[in-house]
Amino acid sequence: MQAARFIFTGVVQGVFFRASTRERALALQLRGHARNQADGSVEVVAAGSAAALEALEHWLWQGSPASKVASVTRTPCAIPTTEAFVTG
């Protein structure tokens, strides 16, 4: 199992980005979270297979129908302790 932390900027808050991310992450059998940040970005921490993380990253560039992702930063991180994928 691998884990990654993504920071997304652009129009990613108030456009169902986190809810859509949760749906996609669950479909890919990932665990972790998606959280709004004070600076207007969204943090996504996800853990699972390397292929599932790649698929999530690819999908997240599109995000929800109303989102407009401007940039993505990906860094390795510790595997989250949660067994589910949550938004907050």
UniProtKB/Swiss-Prot annotation:
Family annotation (Gene3D superfamilies): 3.30.70.100
EC number: 3.6.1.7
Residues the record marks as active site: 18, 36
Keywords, comma-separated and alphabetical: Hydrolase
Residue ranges of domain Acylphosphatase-like in the record: 3-88
Keyword Hydrolase: yes
Family statement drawn from the similarity comment of this UniProt entry: Belongs to the acylphosphatase family.
PANTHER family: ACYLPHOSPHATASE
Name assigned to this protein: Acylphosphatase
Annotated source species: Xanthomonas campestris pv. campestris (strain ATCC 33913 / DSM 3586 / NCPPB 528 / LMG 568 / P 25)
Name of the gene encoding the protein in the UniProt record: acyP
